Curated annotation (Swiss-Prot):
Keywords: Amino-acid biosynthesis, Aromatic amino acid biosynthesis, Lyase, Pyridoxal phosphate, Tryptophan biosynthesis
The protein's annotated pathway: Amino-acid biosynthesis; L-tryptophan biosynthesis; L-tryptophan from chorismate: step 5/5
Coiled-coil annotated residue ranges, if any: none
Gene Ontology MF term list: tryptophan synthase activity
Name listed for the protein in its UniProt record: Tryptophan synthase beta chain
Source species taxonomy: Bacteria, Pseudomonadati, Pseudomonadota, Alphaproteobacteria, Hyphomicrobiales
EC id: 4.2.1.20
């Protein structure tokens, strides 16, 4: 008998306490518990209300531009087959979330949370952001619905993501640079939580990933699951069957969970998540929580975290501001321990190679975040048979990264 027998379904979590096995839960200040419970009830009510689903679908179609295309990356497929033994080399598809309004998958979740905030009568929205994509999506939806928007962003990220900072301000958001700690995503989330405790009556906290206290990990996953639901349908239409493998990058892990969740019980579908290895996991300068971390509690949930010997949260590093987080969503931690998803990591250097290759071969400049996953597609695809169907979640476009990448390549803009 195995200690962790595979469950009948990988899609039933979390339990009523918000746990995925030993992960998840809600470790929050007493002040926040009433808010969390209100949110849980409001979300349960919204899920049961056909008008909420109808609004999600209507705005998804007419405002976001869903469904996003599933695209056969023909030249990348040919390029990798040329390096593979005869008869090898997977057929590669991109789920093109970068074509959504605002340029990434983030808007799927924000739409759901903003519609929920309106149902709850909360006129002030706060959010944390790393790469700025979640901040831009939140500012965008707040502008659309006439809500006040405050975005917390680490001061380091404010510098390296200047185009997105300007976008948020153009959309009417107040952007607050966070100077504490490492001045990145973790610290932005800390400040947003402090704000929420202080302004409980009128404020809704729009979390950007599948982390935080319950019900956030499940709620964000549900709003992002449109990615996987569409992929299933599109692949059946294009190829007459399900894909053989899925691959996505992971910071907190919402784009990955959105793609993965609808496929978790399709046991023949291989699933790969790709963390940020920075300068290499052995260097200590990385953001690969599953590869280089251990279980602990941060931002209201128990999950895998980067910690030092004393249990203090360690600094994360990634070339990509959106993956520069010392933790991972609790459902990913559980799927890792259950063995359902294989978690890999990609270095900054591997990511830049993939970024260049995708741009040159497909005419698509990817964000640095999905370029991490793309680097593992370049490794995995040549090892698979030619009939193998592989789907990459192209979760964001690279416009925001052009100044940073140009600087790395020694170009002056």
């Amino acid at each position: 008998m195995t200690l962790n027998p595979a469950p009948n379904s990988f899609r039933t979590g979390p339990d009523e306490r918000g746990r995925f096995g030993i992960f998840g839960g809600r470790f929050v200040a007493e002040t926040l518990m009433p808010l969390i419970l209100d949110l849980e009830k409001a979300y349960a009510d919204a899920k049961a209300d056909p008008s909420f689903k109808a609004d999600m679908e209507s705005y998804g179609t007419h405002y976001i531009g869903r469904p996003s295309p599933l695209y056969f990356a023909e030249r990348l497929t040919e390029h990798l087959r040329a390096q593979a033994p005869a008869g090898q080399g997977a057929k590669i598809f991109f789920k093109r979330e970068e074509l959504n309004h605002t340029g990434s998958h983030k808007v799927n979740n924000v739409l759901g949370q903003i519609l929920l905030a309106r149902r709850m009568g909360k006129p002030r929205i706060i959010a944390e952001t790393g790469a700025g994509q979640h901040g831009v999506a939140t500012a965008t939806l707040c502008a659309r619905f006439g809500l006040k928007c405050v975005v917390y962003m680490g001061a380091v990220d404010v510098e390296r993501q200047a185009p997105n900072v300007f976008r948020m301000k153009m959309l009417g958001a107040e952007v607050i640079p966070v100077q504490s700690g490492t001045r990145t995503l973790k610290d932005a989330m800390n400040e947003a939580l402090r704000d929420w405790v202080t302004n409980v009556s009128d404020t809704f906290y729009c979390i950007g990933t599948v982390a935080g206290p319950h019900p956030y990990p499940a709620m964000v996953r549900d709003f992002q699951s449109v990615i996987g639901i569409e992929t299933k349908q599109q692949m059946l239409e294009m190829e007459g069957r399900l894909p053989d493998s899925l691959i996505a990058c992971i910071g907190g892990g919402s784009n990955a969970m959105g793609l993965f969740h609808p496929f978790l019980d399709d046991r023949d579908v291989e699933i790969y998540g790709v963390e940020a290895a920075g300068h290499g996991v052995q260097s200590g300068l990385h953001a690969a929580s599953l590869t280089g971390g251990r279980p602990g509690v941060l931002h209201g949930n128990r999950t895998y975290l980067l910690m030092n010997e004393d249990g203090q949260i360690a600094d994360a590093h990634s070339i990509s501001a959106g993956l520069d987080y010392p933790g991972i969503g609790p459902e990913h931690a559980w799927l890792h321990e259950m063995g359902r998803v294989t978690y890999l990591s990609a270095t900054d250097a591997e990511t830049l190679e993939a970024f260049k290759l995708c741009s040159m071969l497909e005419g698509i400049i990817p964000a640095l975040e999905p370029a991490h996953a793309l680097s593992k597609v370049m490794e995995l695809a040549p090892t698979k048979p030619a009939e193998h169907l592989m789907v990459l979640n192209l979760s964001g476009r690279g416009d925001k990264d052009i100044p940073q990448v140009a600087q790395i390549f020694g170009q002056t803009l």
